[in-house]
Every structure is written in structure tokens, then in C-alpha cells.
Amino acid sequence: TGPIERNDTTTVKKHLNVLDANEKHIYISVSGAVLALAEQKYPDRDYSEMKKILSGQE
């Protein structure tokens, strides 16, 4: 959860690169929930790049 809340896109990309398809699906599902909480906690942060990464657009 740390890299999502910190908006650490580099770490999230590294995580996704080493996971198999099933693990990646789980990681992305959980990360979406964490991202929603982070956006509420830190409304001034721009999480648009993180959203792209987690949606597979990055």
C-alpha cells in the first residue's frame, strides 16, 4: 500500500513487472481500493499517472 499512497509510480511499475498474470490481477484490484483511499486522504495529490499504470495504459 505504501507506494500507492506515496504516488511512487516507479515502485508500482517494478512490482507489476515481476508478477505473473494472476498476481498482477490481484495487485491491481487491491491497489484500486488503496488508490481510492489515498485520493480521499490526499486530495491535493495528482494520482493520474498512477491510474494510468494500474489501468494498463502506461
PLM feature spans:
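NAD(P)-dependent Rossmann-like dehydrogenase/reductase catalytic/cofactor-binding core
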Residues: 1-58
